Curated annotation (Swiss-Prot):
Domain of life, per lineage: Eukaryota
Membrane topology: Single-pass membrane protein
Official protein name in the record: Uncharacterized protein YIR021W-A
Organism: Saccharomyces cerevisiae (strain ATCC 204508 / S288c) (Baker's yeast)
GO cellular component: membrane
Keyword terms, alphabetized: Membrane, Transmembrane, Transmembrane helix
Places the protein is found: Membrane
Chain ranges passing through the membrane: 15-37
């Protein structure tokens, strides 16, 4: 629904992009919480691979910010 509106006005597009970025950050935080709550090494391998992929995409879109910690 919101995609047809966002194509018409650049302001809405900017809002949409910022909300997607916030969703990406939230997803990373949730994934890290899952990583610490589940102690299984298989899950740790899979989740840390997902986090690395998500961080690569996120930090490519926002070059100013740098990863803090590991």
């Amino acid at each position: 629904m919101s995609f047809s509106v966002s194509c018409k006005t650049p302001k809405t597009t900017k809002l949409l992009v910022s909300s997607i970025s916030e969703s990406a950050v939230a997803l990373i935080i949730i994934t890290i919480r899952i990583l610490f709550s589940i102690g299984k090494s298989d899950f740790k391998k899979i989740i840390s691979k997902e986090i690395n992929g998500a961080e690569t995409i996120y930090y490519r879109n926002i070059p100013e910010s740098k990863p803090q910690g590991s």
